[in-house]
């Protein structure tokens, strides 16, 4: 397959995310709105390029006729690295060495994770995430309001539900025993990835 420009890579990831989360692809209007294009014809040019590059297939004359090309469909087995631990409680220091590689069934995850982290703590139990679980994380630097994220705050890592309020961020635990974390403007904060499923081992 051909290498994509950053813009087309972003459009392809948007298509893949919409299919994974909603069961159907975006329309040309959805793509134009998401990326600020002046018209659907600009979105159509990018879709045509993605199709020619072998990333997607398009059924003509259908409003939502985009689908992932066959080679990009999920493999029967995923090989995912475990990169350490993430705090479900107070943030903990990073632990990013590859601890092990696991062969996993893709059906465990809504989207294919880039890596797994082992949960330490109980602040996310109301979302069904428990101490010792392995959470699948899709690496990306942004997230929507309400998504579960792995975030780095002043060099320490935590898993929480993200609340966006204008230009401010709040990290919400899902256990009433814990208080929300209000991210201050002077703090070093960024999102490392979004939660896409978990594995619980006995």
Swiss-Prot record:
It is an enzyme of class 3 (hydrolase). The active site is at 123 (for autocatalytic cleavage activity), 160 (for autocatalytic cleavage activity). GO terms for biological process: DNA repair; DNA replication; negative regulation of DNA-templated transcription; proteolysis; SOS response. Keywords: Autocatalytic cleavage, DNA damage, DNA repair, DNA replication, DNA-binding, Hydrolase, Repressor, SOS response, Transcription, Transcription regulation. Residues 28-48 bind DNA. GO terms for molecular function: DNA-binding transcription repressor activity; serine-type endopeptidase activity; transcription cis-regulatory region binding. The keyword DNA damage applies. GO terms for cellular component: protein-DNA complex. The record marks 88-89 as: Cleavage. Its EC number is 3.4.21.88. Pfam families: LexA_DNA_bind, Peptidase_S24. InterPro entries: LexA, LexA-like, LexA/Signal_pep-like_sf, LexA_DNA-bd_dom, LexA_repressor, Peptidase_S24_LexA, Peptidase_S24_S26A/B/C, WH-like_DNA-bd_sf. It catalyses: Hydrolysis of Ala-|-Gly bond in repressor LexA. Homodimer. Belongs to the peptidase S24 family. Represses a number of genes involved in the response to DNA damage (SOS response), including recA and lexA. In the presence of single-stranded DNA, RecA interacts with LexA causing an autocatalytic cleavage which disrupts the DNA-binding part of LexA, leading to derepression of the SOS regulon and eventually DNA repair. NCBIfam families: lexA. This is LexA repressor 2. It comes from Pseudomonas putida (strain ATCC 47054 / DSM 6125 / CFBP 8728 / NCIMB 11950 / KT2440). The gene is lexA2.
